[in-house]
Amino acid sequence: MPTYNQLVRFGRKSKIRKTKSPALESNPFKSGVCLVVKTVTPKKPNSALRKIATVRLSNKRTVNAYIPGEKHSVKEHDRVLVRGGQVPDLPGVKYHIVLGAYDIAGVKGRKQGRSRYGATRKQVAATKK
């Protein structure tokens, strides 16, 4: 416990919190250009081929970003929008690519959780009585 005089002289130091997505620089999203699209295997005990892309952001930083959903249209040199969000079983992947933004199409045939995958609502035909 500090003395009153110590508080007057030095004050209280607030804890510095470390950000989980430093490359975004406190922005919700950053745009970038896709450099490489590849598949990686997750940590134990999971098994899959997860799709990731190496992206050069508009602030000149290079990050690995996860491509969510089934099937994707991400190619080299595509413009992408990147948001924060880690992938639990992929070490070093701290970002997600936003589907349905810029050059990236949304997941086709998606009925639930559409907003996360950039899928549009299927129009139901009006029936006559």
UniProtKB/Swiss-Prot annotation:
<dbReference type="GO" id="GO:0006412">
    <property type="term" value="P:translation"/>
</dbReference>
<keyword id="KW-0820">tRNA-binding</keyword>
<protein>
    <recommendedName>
        <fullName>Small ribosomal subunit protein uS12</fullName>
    </recommendedName>
</protein>
<dbReference type="Pfam" id="PF00164">
    <property type="entry name" value="Ribosom_S12_S23"/>
</dbReference>
<dbReference type="GO" id="GO:0003735">
    <property type="term" value="F:structural constituent of ribosome"/>
</dbReference>
<dbReference type="InterPro" id="IPR005679">
    <property type="entry name" value="Ribosomal_uS12_bac"/>
</dbReference>
<keyword id="KW-0689">Ribosomal protein</keyword>
<keyword id="KW-0687">Ribonucleoprotein</keyword>
<keyword id="KW-0699">rRNA-binding</keyword>
<dbReference type="InterPro" id="IPR006032">
    <property type="entry name" value="Ribosomal_uS12"/>
</dbReference>
<comment type="function">
    <text>Interacts with and stabilizes bases of the 16S rRNA that are involved in tRNA selection in the A site and with the mRNA backbone. Located at the interface of the 30S and 50S subunits, it traverses the body of the 30S subunit contacting proteins on the other side and probably holding the rRNA structure together. The combined cluster of proteins S8, S12 and S17 appears to hold together the shoulder and platform of the 30S subunit.</text>
</comment>
<comment type="function">
    <text>With S4 and S5 plays an important role in translational accuracy.</text>
</comment>
<dbReference type="GO" id="GO:0019843">
    <property type="term" value="F:rRNA binding"/>
</dbReference>
<comment type="similarity">
    <text>Belongs to the universal ribosomal protein uS12 family.</text>
</comment>
<dbReference type="GO" id="GO:0015935">
    <property type="term" value="C:small ribosomal subunit"/>
</dbReference>
<comment type="subunit">
    <text>Part of the 30S ribosomal subunit. Contacts proteins S8 and S17. May interact with IF1 in the 30S initiation complex.</text>
</comment>
<keyword id="KW-0694">RNA-binding</keyword>
<dbReference type="GO" id="GO:0000049">
    <property type="term" value="F:tRNA binding"/>
</dbReference>
<dbReference type="InterPro" id="IPR012340">
    <property type="entry name" value="NA-bd_OB-fold"/>
</dbReference>
